[in-house]
Regions:
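Extended interfacial segments that mediate partner engagement and assembly in macromolecular machines
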Residues: 1-51, 55
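Peripheral terminal and linker regions in Fe-S/redox and tRNA-modifying enzymes
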Residues: 1, 41, 45-48, 66, ...
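Carbohydrate-binding surface patches
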Residues: 61, 66-74
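Short small-residue beta-strand/loop micro-motif enriched in glycine and branched aliphatics
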Residues: 20-26, 67-70, 130
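Secondary-structure transition/turn motif
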Residues: 14-18, 71-76
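Short strand-connecting beta-turns/loops that link adjacent beta-strands
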Residues: 5-8, 63-65, 124
Length: 238
């Protein structure tokens, strides 16, 4: 996002090739159509805000049910600015999130919209709630295919005990748990582990899953022994 005084407007788009300039875009063929169709209204909205010079970036996340736009705001919004954002949110069916500092500082303008972004795995009925800045596969249908493929390749049985390394939010862990006796998800981030546990609870899989925060780049034979003893053996590893 950049205000261009000579053009009397705000540009919203990607950087030009090998440049810090923002491309003057009114549509984008590689974005979902409903996002592409928002480029012009979004430009008009931001151009009307008092903090348009303090809004350098927008991130987005899209699912079939929701479209979240994360505004990188460098100063507090005025009441008038927030009213305009709320009206835009209502008119175009988007969910605005604010990011005042680093990626972990994001929060939704309306708290009730915090759980609207979800990854679905229809075969197992698992839903994984994620935030707009979380790492997920950009193609959610392909993500679902990948999870299903993993279920097939692992040849899971009701007695299987599985370890899922770099489990993140439990995108694979939770579907695996629907076909196994126990799945241990291991992830480097304590925050992601906490959220994976919450996801297991939401999907009624807390009794079939465990999550641990560990530095997987320092994994040793002693760690293998520890998880082996904890699970009473390991049948599958992902």
């Amino acid at each position: 996002v950049r205000e261009v005084a000579k053009k009397g407007t705000v540009l919203v788009g990607f950087h030009e090739k090998r440049s810090s300039f923002i491309a003057d875009m009114k549509s984008c063929e590689i974005l979902p159509k409903r996002v592409s169709d928002l480029l012009v209204p979004l430009r008009e909205l931001i151009n009307s805000l008092s903090l348009r010079k303090k809004l350098p970036q927008i991130e987005l996340a899209v699912t079939d049910e929701a479209l979240a736009l994360v505004l990188r705001v460098l100063e507090k919004l005025t009441a008038d600015d927030e009213a305009k954002l709320r009206q835009f949110q209502k008119d175009y069916g988007v969910d605005f999130w604010y990011q005042p500092k680093g990626p972990d500082s994001i929060y939704p303008m309306d708290p009730e919209n915090a759980a609207r972004l979800k990854l679905h795995h229809r075969e197992t009925g698992v839903e994984v709630v994620f935030r707009p800045t979380d790492f997920t596969q950009v193609n959610h249908r392909l993500n679902e295919v990948m999870v299903t493929r993993a279920l097939r390749l692992l040849h899971l049985e009701p007695s299987s005990k599985v370890i899922d390394f770099f489990c993140g939010l439990g995108n694979f862990t939770l579907p695996l748990a629907t076909r196994s006796a126990k799945v241990l998800g291991i992830e480097g981030s304590t925050e992601l582990v906490d959220r994976a546990r919450a996801g297991a609870k939401d999907n009624n899989l807390a009794d079939k899953t465990e999550f641990e925060a560990r530095n997987l780049f320092d994994w040793t034979l002693d760690d293998w022994d520890a998880v082996w003893n904890k699970l009473g053996g390991v049948d599958r590893v992902l």
